[in-house]
Each structure stands twice: as C-alpha cells, then as structure tokens.
C-alpha cells in the first residue's frame, strides 16, 4: 500500500520530470512521524547510473551519509528539519520538511505544499498503530470524510479549494484529536478568459479570432497547455497547443454562446472559461436614391401642412378672442340700461307718494274751514 502511494505521489502533475534534478521520496510517504518510528528517504534522479555518489543535507549542512537512501531508525526530535539531496552532477533536490511528533493521534500528509492537480494523501495515525475507529477528517474545522474503521484518504486531484488546515479525530479508549497541519495548493494557471477580435454584434463576412487567454503561474520543463473551443455543446476544435481559433467568414448561423477550455497534457488540471456571446447580423443593402427623394419630399409636405394648420389655428384663436370681448362689452351695457330703468321707476314711485301726501293735506284744510264759519 505504501509503495503504491509513494509511486502515485512521485509522478508530477504534468507528466514531465526534470531529469537533471534530484527528487526525494519517503518510505512510508509521510512528512510527519511519531518518535521511535522508522522512516527512509530516497534520492532519485532519472537516467542516472546507480553508482553515482550521493550527498545529503540537513538544514543546509552536509551529513555523513553518501548512499542514495537515508534511513532514520527510532526517530527523535533531533531528526526534524529540512532535507535535500544531490546525486553526481544532478541539481540539488527541492526540500522535504520532516517533523517528529509526540502524542496519541497524528494526521500524516504526503506533503505540505502541492501544485494543483497533484494527489494529496492523508492518514489518521495512532501511536504504535493502536486501533482507531469512527475516524473523522476535517478541513478548516469542518468534517468532510468519515470512516467507521480507520482508513487512509487520498484526494486524487487537488485544486485551490483544498487549501487549509487539516486534522483528524478518532475513537480509542477515548475520543482523540490530532494537531492541525497546514496544506497549501499552488495554482498552476488561472481559469481562461475567452476574447473575440471584434465586438458583438457584428456583420456577416467578418473574420473573427477567438483567444483563450490564461498563463502558467509555475514554470516547469516541458509543461505545455492545451486548448479546446466550443459553441454551446458543439466542439469547434479539440485539444491543441494554439490558444486561438478563427471564424474565417462569420455567418448568421455562427451566432451563439462560445467558451473554451485550458488543460495540462495529461488532463489532470482542466479549467473552463465563462461564456462569450457572439451575434452575427445579416448584411444591410445600400438605400436607393429614390428612397431618399421620397423621404425628404414627405418631410417637406408634412412641414408645409403643419405650418398652414398653425397659421389657421392662430387666426381662429384671435377671432374667437375678439368675439368673446364683444359679448363681454354687450353684457356690461345691458346691465347699465337695466340699472337706469330701475332708478327711474324708483323716482316715479317717490313722486306718486309725494303727490298723495299733498292731496291728503289739502283735504284736511278743506274740512277745517266750514267748522270756523259756524
């Protein structure tokens, strides 16, 4: 089991190996072990004769070991540190950080730093291989995997969502919890963005170049990205090293949603772009001269009609205002005549009253005269 895990972890994500650089592998394949356990480090270089001399370094200092294998028996805290190796004329290996722990439960990982697409192996390991059951694996404090009986866990293709702090818990005589261990997954390349050489909508007949744009964030010998182009569910072009696709003569049937994929050669890392909408319009025929003549003639007639209507309406409004004024004046004169007639009637009534009073006085005088004569 350990041999298969080691072999799986040793193969790089892109299938390419720098044959001039040494690589350290571990047996068992864990970068953290308990005290008193045994671990062996192997210095490997492809296509290098086995008789080449080997140099080991611990925390930057050369050690006494000159064999391709560096064996640590009954590990102690003093064996913790950064290991590198070099064989013959090869380049010095990348560092391996080995940690020696004390405790009852230990979460073991195959490495602390990964490139996305590489496998991550985890093991919830008890002191002296004691029986552990009801095992839970956690990432950033949240349980994500449960085993009734203890079992190793492998994430075959890591991505940046697997960044975080991992720990495990399990039942023995009691419920035990391991310390946390930080795991970093480096992004190999960002998700691509699909761009077009012309803006949408566009006219039929145009040349359109689609570009699937991304870039490698980590450089490795022989690492190459492959690109595919799609319209909806239709494949326009399969895997190819060119990041461009051309529509030589755009037609209306080329309208649709386009997207692309970028992937490593082995397909371990594959990322899709957001969709890009292209709208192709039919060609517009040139407008004939007679149409322009008719158009401007119609506009002129409409302007003339509007002008005549405006003048007519204005005259009508003026005439109506004058007529309303005359009616108003006539109403005022009529009121004055009525008022004058009412005054004349009042005077006539007063004169009649006065005449009646005078007549009554005269009658009174005539009645008194005969009485005096007697």
From Swiss-Prot:
Record region (Interaction with EPB41L2): 312-332
Presence of the UniProt keyword Zinc in the record: no
Source superkingdom: Eukaryota
UniProt tissue specificity: Monocyte/macrophage specific.
Pfam families, alphabetized: ig, Ig_2, Ig_3
GO biological process: antibody-dependent cellular cytotoxicity; antigen processing and presentation of exogenous peptide antigen via MHC class I; cell surface receptor signaling pathway; defense response to bacterium; Fc-gamma receptor signaling pathway; immune response; innate immune response; phagocytosis, engulfment
Keywords: Cell membrane, Disulfide bond, Glycoprotein, IgG-binding protein, Immunity, Immunoglobulin domain, Innate immunity, Membrane, Phosphoprotein, Receptor, Repeat, Signal, Transmembrane, Transmembrane helix
Compartments where located: Cell membrane
InterPro entries associated with the record: Ig-like_dom, Ig-like_dom_sf, Ig-like_fold, Ig_Fc_receptor, Ig_sub, Ig_sub2, Immunoglobulin_dom
PROSITE patterns: IG_LIKE
One annotated Gene Ontology cellular component of this protein: plasma membrane
Annotated Ig-like C2-type domain residues: 22-101, 95-184, 190-277
Keyword Transmembrane found: yes
Quaternary structure and partners: Interacts with IGHG1. Interacts with FCERG1; forms a functional signaling complex. Interacts with FLNA; prevents FCGR1A degradation. Interacts with EPB41L2, LAT and PPL. Interacts with HCK and LYN.
PANTHER family in the record: HIGH AFFINITY IMMUNOGLOBULIN GAMMA FC RECEPTOR I-RELATED, IMMUNOGLOBULIN FC RECEPTOR
Protein task: High affinity receptor for the Fc region of immunoglobulins gamma. Functions in both innate and adaptive immune responses. Mediates IgG effector functions on monocytes triggering antibody-dependent cellular cytotoxicity (ADCC) of virus-infected cells.
Protein's name according to its UniProt entry: High affinity immunoglobulin gamma Fc receptor I
Protein source organism: Homo sapiens
Origin organism lineage: Eukaryota, Metazoa, Chordata, Craniata, Vertebrata
């Amino acid at each position: 089991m350990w041999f298969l895990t080691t072999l799986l972890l040793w193969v790089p994500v892109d299938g390419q190996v720098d044959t001039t650089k040494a690589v350290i592998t571990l047996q068992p394949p864990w970068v953290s072990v308990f005290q008193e356990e045994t671990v062996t480090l192997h210095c490997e270089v492809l296509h290098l004769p086995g008789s080449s001399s080997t140099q080991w370094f611990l925390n930057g200092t050369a050690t006494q070991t000159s064999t391709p294998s560096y064996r640590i028996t009954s590990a102690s805290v003093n064996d913790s540190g950064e290991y590198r190796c070099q064989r013959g004329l090869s380049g010095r290996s990348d560092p391996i950080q080995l940690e020696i722990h004390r405790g009852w439960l230990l979460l073991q990982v195959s490495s602390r730093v990964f490139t996305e697409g590489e496998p991550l192996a985890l093991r919830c390991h008890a002191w002296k291989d004691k029986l552990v059951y009801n095992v839970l694996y956690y990432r950033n404090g949240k349980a994500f995997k449960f085993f009734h009986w203890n079992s190793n866990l492998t994430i075959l293709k890591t991505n940046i969502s697997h960044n975080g702090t991992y720990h495990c818990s399990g039942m023995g005589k009691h419920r035990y919890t391991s310390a946390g261990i930080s795991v970093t997954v480096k992004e190999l390349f960002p998700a691509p963005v699909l761009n077009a050489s012309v803006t949408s909508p566009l006219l039929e007949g145009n040349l359109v170049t689609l570009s699937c744009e991304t870039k490698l964030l980590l450089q490795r010998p022989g690492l190459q990205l492959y690109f595919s182009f799609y319209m909806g569910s239709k494949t326009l072009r399969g895997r190819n090293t060119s990041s461009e696709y051309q529509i030589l003569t755009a037609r209306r049937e080329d309208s649709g949603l386009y997207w692309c994929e970028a992937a490593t050669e082995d397909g371990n890392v594959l990322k899709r772009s957001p969709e890009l909408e292209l709208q192709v319009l039919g060609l517009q025929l040139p407008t004939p001269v007679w149409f322009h003549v008719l158009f401007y003639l119609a506009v002129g007639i409409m302007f003339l009609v509007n002008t005549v209507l405006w003048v007519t309406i204005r005259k009508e409004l003026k005439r109506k205002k004058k007529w309303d004024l005359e009616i108003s004046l006539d109403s005022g004169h009529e009121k004055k005549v009525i008022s004058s007639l009412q005054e004349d009637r009042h005077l006539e009534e007063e004169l009649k009253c006065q005449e009646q009073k005078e007549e009554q006085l005269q009658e009174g005088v005539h009645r008194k005269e005969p009485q005096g004569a007697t």
